[in-house]
Amino acid sequence: MGASEKRKDYISWDEYFMGIAMLSGMRSKDPNTQVGACIVDPEHKILSMGYNGFPLGCSDDEFTWAREGEDNKYFYSTHSELNAILNYRGGSLEGATIYVTLFPCNECAKAIIQSGIREVVYDCDKYENTPSVIASKRMLDAAGVRLSLIHISEPTRLGM
């Protein structure tokens, strides 16, 4: 490569924003599941980020992280997609893309659709056969939200 030529081995926009979503997920205190989201406008500007966790003012140390039982994390935890949508302090999210490390559940799909986000780019769909994700895909499809699966390669995950 000559000094006057640009580098050819740089990452794509999708890899970049999914990497940011993955990094956001690393902020989650959930011992079992860490999910991150990054919302981007059509000009590739980051609008908002989020990760799964408890609402503001709800202590990570006082509320349970248990997955089962009468008192479990599902009563308290906010998913990364909803956190990213609620964290946005600008105007409209109309036409935006959300990058998320795990395919959105049905509740997050509703928020994605209502916010005007037009594309979901996801890295993992491990719950694809669950009623929640089946409903999510049905709603997103009906609303015309584009779905794109992107797998980030291990060297990219490690920053190499």
Label the model's feature ranges:
Residues 1-153, 157:
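Zinc-dependent deaminase catalytic domain
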